Amino acid sequence: MTEEACRTRSQKRALERDPTEDDVESKKIKMERGLLASDLNTDGDMRVTPEPGAGPTQGLLRATEATAMAMGRGEGLVGDGPVDMRTSHSDMKSERRPPSPDVIVLSDNEQPSSPRVNGLTTVALKETSTEALMKSSPEERERMIKQLKEELRLEEAKLVLLKKLRQSQIQKEATAQKPTGSVGSTVTTPPPLVRGTQNIPAGKPSLQTSSARMPGSVIPPPLVRGGQQASSKLGPQASSQVVMPPLVRGAQQIHSIRQHSSTGPPPLLLAPRASVPSVQIQGQRIIQQGLIRVANVPNTSLLVNIPQPTPASLKGTTATSAQANSTPTSVASVVTSAESPASRQAAAKLALRKQLEKTLLEIPPPKPPAPEMNFLPSAANNEFIYLVGLEEVVQNLLETQGRMSAATVLSREPYMCAQCKTDFTCRWREEKSGAIMCENCMTTNQKKALKVEHTSRLKAAFVKALQQEQEIEQRLLQQGTAPAQAKAEPTAAPHPVLKQVIKPRRKLAFRSGEARDWSNGAVLQASSQLSRGSATTPRGVLHTFSPSPKLQNSASATALVSRTGRHSERTVSAGKGSATSNWKKTPLSTGGTLAFVSPSLAVHKSSSAVDRQREYLLDMIPPRSIPQSATWK
């Protein structure tokens, strides 16, 4: 076509359709979004495409004057017909180039190439499907793979940016919430709780008012936490009242507690949070396992929770405790000499249990293997960038020079995990047997092997301790059967008593009978001096054979005290003569009941070794949150 035909055609179009400003703006938006192809089908416009070397403005000026006048108004170029906008973003740069004398005119029926989206054409995006990839030739396949790699890199970059944005938003929210939380945490704590390393001074008004109450009142205990020092000193006017002790938690020291009343029970012991040394409070050795009160003070009236005592009952209990203190030492020596088998058995089992716990602590827990990745891939890491560049160079060399080798590598079958049958993992592992496994299966197998090894070591330690404990029981039973038969011949009355003491109690029976034992012991102590002596002397015996500062079988110790309390009740009904002979028998019976794994072998010989081992393993689990008395049978 000539320049005159172009000129006449453009003048015709300018006369037929004078575009408004809105049309111009909408056309601009459509062209920028790549939606111009649909308009071209309906309009049938002539498309004028400048040569790549020539700017669109100067080429059209040379082509036609009417187009130049329309461009002076800012309407003609867009209004006449759409122009290929592939160079529309670089108009300023293209104006500096020398103008081209040629104008390339395309026909109306020709479809324009689709605009670029992110550097890629939409047509190419449609072609990269799985079927097209399988049907295409190797060259096209490589081109598609490169294209997909570029897309993947772009998506990964977007993902990293989104993660960074989310992380920064979360950090801003956390910093905004911190001051509000600090304002809310300044609530005043209730006055009975004492926190931190604080001292309770002697002149506090709360303590003064509590010490000035009636003589028969009971002072509730303050709750002490942390490494505190409760240095409260009670006045002399509190000499006739029962002072409840403070709750002791953790490794605390309670200094200078002056309890002028002789009937105050020892401090309550909450379960310790760690291994805690025993607290010494004026000669009281306290066994710190669970909520159990045990102390070797003989005047604690069998550690009964006293409900609001009257002054008369207080005087009676102080008198009885004074009389119990004045018992002759010969009786205590006789009882301790008779208790030697039980004391030896308890001491041996204590040592065995401590040794087992020591060996269990020495066995390390299973640890997962350390990750083998030496560095994290990051664009900020120079070594990683070097590796990326090296990989690109090697890949290009393989593609350009080693065509055949690359084809053989591509045709190889992918790996598949022998365990989970997956074909994708970050790293393939080959076992010694030749099986190929994925990273996930390999790590789970390693963890399972470590767990099995750990449990086998624990079982070996338990079985060894069980054998030693059985040997100790058999030796003590062989030693104790002969003197038991010799002493059981003169009297026939105490045999049912012995059977009832030897009979094992389960957990619920022990708990339900415990309160009755304590109350019966208190009534007997106030009524008869003989029962006082029999009830208080085993407490001394208990602490002669358990001098350990970290005594851990406190439940068996309380069981011994409760059984002696029941035994004393029967001795009062039987008479003085049978009571003295029964007290000679009790060392053997209580020795039989102190079995810390299972009940006495004399009663449960029919139980199989498997049941004994199961009970033993259940009992030897170190108690974390439950009280110690709940795990003992």
Swiss-Prot record:
Compositionally biased spans, kind Polar residues: 108-119, 172-188, 196-212, 228-238
Record's keyword annotation contains Calcium: no
Gene3D superfamilies assigned to the protein according to its UniProt record, in alphabetical order: 6.10.250.1650
Keywords recorded for this protein, A-Z: Chromosome, Coiled coil, Isopeptide bond, Metal-binding, Methylation, Nucleus, Phosphoprotein, Repressor, Transcription, Transcription regulation, Ubl conjugation, Zinc, Zinc-finger
Annotated stretches, region: CR2: 340-480
GO biological process, one term: positive regulation of DNA-templated transcription
Zinc finger map (GATA-type): 411-464
Region (Disordered), start-end ranges: 1-59, 73-119, 172-238, 561-585
Location of the protein in the cell: Nucleus speckle; Nucleus; Chromosome
Interaction with ZMYND8: annotated span: 181-295
Gene Ontology cellular-component annotations: nuclear speck; nucleoplasm; nucleus; NuRD complex
Annotated TM spans: none
Modified residues (Asymmetric dimethylarginine): 539
Modified residues (Phosphoserine): 100, 107, 113-114, 137, 275, 340, 343, 512, 546, 548, 556, 598
Domain notes: Both CR1 and CR2 regions are required for speckled nuclear localization.
Protein name: Transcriptional repressor p66-alpha
Organism: Homo sapiens (Human)
